[in-house]
Amino acid sequence: MAGAPRRQRAVGRVRLGVNAIAGKSRVSDVAEAGSLRVRMPRVDGPAVEGVLVNTAGGVACGDHFTIEVKAEAGAHAVVATPAAEKIYRSDGETARIDVAITVEAGAQVDWLPQETLLYDAARLARRFTVDLAPDATFLAFEAIAFGRVARGEEMRTGHLEDHWQVTRGGGLIYADAVRVSGPLGELLRRPTVAAGNRAWATLLYVAPDAEARLDEARALMESARSECGASAWNGLLAARWLAPDIETLRRDAVAFLNAFRGAPLPRVWAL
């Protein structure tokens, strides 16, 4: 007897390219496939804003999404999402999200998606690859919430792999790998993991002035309710937040990002 048919999974791909003409950034390349789209709202200012939209309504077991962003010399791209990305319960297969970002000479990319929300028993593997020119600027913020705290859901089990690799001028300057799997509720309660907190976030800022802005970043964290801290080395600045729920973390992070960037977050963050 033939086995059960394989379930249909969502596959999506987006490619966004931005160049600079007369000091203003413009879209130079767009490609979309499957259930992933990118929309460019009208915004004031020199940057192109791209909003990633998942028409599948979330990410389920076995889904695979690929995102490529390239800022050509002197261009500035800001990439965001209109809502939290929901990672639904899996019956065994792992969803994958692959992000590749290229930032050429004098260009800038701000990677500012809203939080990733992991449902109980979700399985996700994400990989970020970032290639920077020596004088490029890259700012990324990523937040993860474990379980729907507002609905009383504890993430009892699940799987998360989160890999970051950043090169500048062809040399590796940052690599970070997180892997938590199995009884996540128990793991998150451990003092050496999350001490019972249910949301965490990472900010990475790579720029010629990154190390010089460390005191500024720490000062902006002084009034935060989350546990947080920042450090800087080798032309990059890294900051982390840890909070009991995503609402607390989000309030702290929004205040930090608005001040640190010197500009408000994309309007979709307020929807």
Curated annotation (Swiss-Prot):
The keyword Chaperone applies. GO terms for molecular function: nickel cation binding. Transmembrane segments: none annotated. Keywords: Chaperone, Cytoplasm, Nickel insertion. Its main location: cytoplasm. InterPro entries: UreD (IPR002669). GO terms for cellular component: cytoplasm. It holds the Pfam family UreD. The keyword Transcription does not apply. It is found in: Cytoplasm. HAMAP family: UreD. Required for maturation of urease via the functional incorporation of the urease nickel metallocenter. Belongs to the UreD family. UreD, UreF and UreG form a complex that acts as a GTP-hydrolysis-dependent molecular chaperone, activating the urease apoprotein by helping to assemble the nickel containing metallocenter of UreC. The UreE protein probably delivers the nickel. This is Urease accessory protein UreD. The gene is ureD.
